[in-house]
């Protein structure tokens, strides 16, 4: 048989099975457990060197027994005796560390080639920097690292010659679509959003939202913080800032569209108006696996996308009145400097207060707007890491102060 007219260099041979060593930050969370599912399914491709977790020992201890890491970190040093006792029968015991220094130690530890950052929030920034300085590639599932720390992280990637690969669905989709696109060929990034728990609610009903309502995501299984962010569409606003840093795209050329089915994970428009998209069932393991295996494609036995079963794919413009957080994120991104760090910290704190039932749902964007307005006059254009961490602390304290005084819910910008 003659060779094909178009040589796309498809190999029917399985890729060489090189075991890749991983350090996993946030092992007991949603990203962490799904990453370990991948490791368990492909033990001939991946091995765990280090685990960093929070306070969930009930979930962490079985992970240690199954994956046998060399080092383990937990958030609370007071839990170390309990963890040591639970592992007393292990013939090979991991090194146990704790606190913020412990997370950074795991991030930089040993012969791990890749660090998966699954820690929620700005807490992932310092350990990610530690991993970069140790020369380890980053599978980024913690968007706040770039949102808050972009001005610091990007130069460090260049300085230490490490790769940062997106491990969340939207930015992985963009990254996959960009494979083979020549420099200068990208015109626009289109981020798709499910619309969250309240996509079909009228604006007037949002004043009645409960925490339980906000945590009912229609498509994805995620942690509570990111599920609330999806309900406010702040998640997508933060992803706009992340896309700006990841792909160097101007904010005017990053668009958000509501796509309720969550089958198209994002799209790119090229200079000739061609549009490329990445499709798949809503499954976080897919972008995680690609970030871990890139540039390879590892065969899986997961359910492939069936377009007939998927049915109609629909799109609509987001409602700026319903989703004011989206506009706040664009404004913070355009302001640059430390302002995205302030936006992110204010959002984290406001969402935590909402989940604790200390504020109403509509107070989340109002608090964020007030904090960003206060900070605008003191924004630092080229912040250091210390500047970013100081801005983060200031924003959290200011949210607490404003919440204690009481705020009026904002419906529209």
Curated annotation (Swiss-Prot):
Which Gene3D superfamilies does the entry link to?
Answer: 1.10.1740.10, NAD(P)-binding Rossmann-like Domain
Q: Name one Pfam family in it.
A: DXP_reductoisom
Q: Which residues bind Mn(2+)?
A: 168, 170, 239
Which cofactor(s) are needed, names only?
Answer: Mg(2+); Mn(2+)
InterPro entries xref list: DXP_reductoisomerase, DXP_reductoisomerase_C, DXP_reductoisomerase_N, DXPR_C, DXPR_C_sf, NAD(P)-bd_dom_sf
Q: Which GO terms describe its biological process?
A: isopentenyl diphosphate biosynthetic process, methylerythritol 4-phosphate pathway involved in terpenoid biosynthetic process
A GO molecular function assigned to this protein is: 1-deoxy-D-xylulose-5-phosphate reductoisomerase activity
EC category name: oxidoreductase
Instruction: State which Enzyme Commission number(s) the record gives.
Output: 1.1.1.267
Catalysed conversion reaction: 2-C-methyl-D-erythritol 4-phosphate + NADP(+) = 1-deoxy-D-xylulose 5-phosphate + NADPH + H(+)
Where do the annotations place 1-deoxy-D-xylulose 5-phosphate binding?
Answer: 143, 169-170, 194, 217, 230, 235-236, 239
On the tree of life, the source organism's domain of life is Bacteria
Q: Where does NADPH bind?
A: 28-31, 54-56, 142, 144, 223
> Isomerase as a keyword?
no
Keywords, comma-separated and alphabetical: Isoprene biosynthesis, Manganese, Metal-binding, NADP, Oxidoreductase
Pathway(s) where this gene product acts: Isoprenoid biosynthesis; isopentenyl diphosphate biosynthesis via DXP pathway; isopentenyl diphosphate from 1-deoxy-D-xylulose 5-phosphate: step 1/6
User: What job does this protein perform?
Assistant: Catalyzes the NADPH-dependent rearrangement and reduction of 1-deoxy-D-xylulose-5-phosphate (DXP) to 2-C-methyl-D-erythritol 4-phosphate (MEP).
Kindly give the PANTHER family that the UniProt entry links to this protein. 1-DEOXY-D-XYLULOSE 5-PHOSPHATE REDUCTOISOMERASE (PTHR30525), 1-DEOXY-D-XYLULOSE 5-PHOSPHATE REDUCTOISOMERASE, CHLOROPLASTIC (PTHR30525:SF0)
Q: Which family does it belong to?
A: Belongs to the DXR family.
Name of the featured protein: 1-deoxy-D-xylulose 5-phosphate reductoisomerase
Q: Which organism is it from?
A: Thermosynechococcus vestitus (strain NIES-2133 / IAM M-273 / BP-1)
């Amino acid at each position: 048989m003659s060779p094909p007219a178009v040589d796309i260099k498809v190999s029917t041979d399985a890729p060489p099975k090189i075991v890749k060593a991983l350090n996993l930050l946030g092992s007991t969370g949603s990203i962490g457990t799904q990453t370990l599912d991948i490791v368990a399914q492909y033990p001939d491709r991946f091995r765990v060197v280090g685990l960093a977790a929070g306070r969930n020992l009930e979930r962490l201890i079985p992970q240690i027994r199954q994956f046998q890491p060399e080092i383990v970190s937990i958030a609370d040093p007071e839990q170390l005796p309990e963890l040591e006792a639970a592992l007393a029968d292990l013939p090979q015991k991991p090194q146990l560390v704790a606190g913020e220094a412990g997370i950074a130690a795991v991030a930089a530890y040993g012969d791990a080639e890749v660090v998966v950052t699954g820690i929620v929030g700005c807490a992932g920034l310092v350990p990610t920097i530690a991993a970069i300085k140790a020369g380890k590639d980053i599978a980024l599932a913690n968007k706040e690292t770039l949102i808050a720390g972009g001005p610091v992280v990007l130069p460090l990637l260049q300085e230490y010659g490490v790769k940062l690969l997106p491990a969340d669905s939207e930015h992985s989709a963009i990254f996959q679509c960009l494979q083979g696109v020549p420099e200068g060929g990208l015109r626009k990034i289109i981020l798709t959003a499910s619309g969250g728990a309240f996509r079909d609610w009228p604006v007037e009903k949002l004043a009645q939202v409960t925490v339980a309502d906000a945590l009912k995501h229609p498509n994805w299984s995620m942690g509570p913080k990111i599920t609330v962010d999806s309900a406010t569409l702040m998640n997508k606003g933060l992803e706009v800032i992340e896309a700006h840093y990841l792909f160097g795209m101007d904010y005017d050329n990053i668009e958000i569209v509501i796509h309720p089915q969550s089958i198209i994970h994002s799209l790119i428009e090229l200079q000739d108006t061609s549009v490329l998209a990445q499709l798949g069932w809503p499954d976080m393991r897919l972008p995680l696996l690609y970030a871990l295996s890139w540039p390879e494609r590892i065969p899986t036995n997961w359910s492939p996308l069936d377009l007939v079963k998927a049915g109609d794919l629909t799109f609509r413009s987001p409602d700026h009145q319903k989703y004011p957080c989206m506009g706040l994120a664009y404004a913070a991104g355009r302001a640059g400097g430390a302002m995205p760090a302030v936006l992110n910290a204010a959002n984290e704190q406001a969402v935590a207060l909402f989940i604790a039932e200390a504020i109403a749902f509509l107070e989340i964007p109002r608090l964020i707007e007030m904090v960003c307005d206060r900070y605008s006059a003191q924004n630092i254009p080229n912040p250091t890491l210390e500047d970013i961490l100081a801005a983060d602390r200031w924003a959290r304290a200011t949210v607490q102060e404003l919440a204690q005084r009481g705020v009026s819910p904002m419906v529209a910008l």
